[in-house]
Amino acid sequence: MHLMALRQRCFGAHAWSLWRYMSSSSHSSAGFNNKKRVPLLWKSSTTTTKPDGDEAITVQLLSWGRGASGQLGGGIEENRLYPAPFASLLLPSSFRLSLPIPGHLPPPPPPPPLPNHLDGNAAVDVEVGISCGLFHSTLLLDGNFWIWGKGDGGRLGFGHENSAFVPTLNPNLDCVRSIALGGLHSVALNSLGQVFTWGYGGFGALGHSVYHRELFPRLVEGSWDGEICHIATSGTHTAAITISGELYTWGRDEGDGRLGLGPGRGPNEAGGLSIPCKVKALPVPVAAVSCGGFFTMALTQEGQLWNWGANSNYELGRGDKVGGWKPQPVPSLKNVHIIQIASGGYHSLALTEAGKVLSWGHGGHGQLGHSSIQNQKIPVIIEALADERVIYIACGGSSSAAITDEGKLYMWGNAKDSQLGVPGLPEVQPFPVEVKFLMEDDGLGTHKVLSVAVGASHAVCLVSRLGC
């Protein structure tokens, strides 16, 4: 058999495209060099064994897509066609994803800890998480965060507007539990339940009553009672949930009602508001929230989905194009238990308790995953993922991602800037494709994807390396 045909048969079309790309890119900054050591960004102070031991595990950050602003973290301006590692973490085996997980219902509370005299070696779990904005990215680890990418507007929070091309520790905020990155700004939640924002303030998404930039993280003085437990943001608006389930929103509203605050313009209504206001029209407590381009979604603790805002592309999934500021449940999901939601620019995803993914809204870039570019009026299960149990979903502006219980990553939608991580795809990829990872000759074994974050034209994922 001809060598080319044999390679295609053995590795598949996408893997062959990847092999061919690597073979022709030896002099490209995006080409893979297995002799280049991935920098160790962080090591647990309690880790005493090697990465292949029982007490430690290697977790890597990989990125792909457009990187002209440094958002890929590799140190240079580059575009990557496939996932490539740019940082490693040596974590205790007890590490977990940082809570709250974006758009996800909170897990059941853990059992109470043993008294110290019964469990003298007990330690607080190390938490790790990632987020992508328009042209910047972040890693959250053990209460600290590293951030990189475009610096315009002060979105990196270093006190200036310079870009960063490698993950850089931000010393201006600690005890961080969750970070959400927007278009030109950033939002963080700390362990005291306080919200901090920084970056471009022209849309009011910072929540500081003024529309100017903030170069450092600044506390949001909200009118809520108690702590905040969940945050979300988009290009121009932000949302926060209190521990009692009240939802507050702020930022830009161009008459579409995405803030959920009323039909007019005023301190308690729907104009672009630069201070947090309670969404009084939401009749039930909520536990998770996701901000789309011009709409908002929220989940109750029982897994019922509510949404509001723009609906010209069926973003709300109600079967018509009638949008508005008033929160309403999605009729076809009345008896479906949703555990996670994710919002794109004009489309929506929902993950059921059974591990199935539903999508609806704008489909022009293939981001709905239904093998077409048609808009979808109501939530429909993505059949290409029907045989998988999905545990995590994410949206970019016009692309989508899902992680299975086996640690496989699928992506679909807009591939114009290689943000799907699979070389050789058309610019519109209308059904999920598995993202393959190169087997580096580093002795760390296979990749298991833990989390993925998708920006407008790039993506970052966390993978555990399962040594042989």
Positions of the model-derived regions?
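N-terminal mitochondrial targeting presequence
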Residues: M1-T46, P51-E55
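Short glycine/serine- and acidic-residue-enriched loop/turn motifs that recur at repeat junctions
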Residues: K35, K50-I57, L61-Y82, S94-L97, ...
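WD40 beta-propeller repeat fold
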Residues: L40-S44, T48-N172, S178-A180, H185-A188, ...
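Conserved core positions of repeat-based scaffolds
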Residues: S63, H136-L139, I147, H185-A188, ...
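Conserved loop/turn at the beginning of each blade in beta-propeller domains
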Residues: I76, A123, S131, H160-S163, ...
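Conserved beta-strand position repeated across blades of beta-propeller domains
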Residues: S131, L139, T168, A180, ...
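Blade-level signature of beta-propeller repeat domains, shared across WD40, Kelch, NHL, RCC1
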Residues: K408-L409, N414, P423-L425, P430-C468
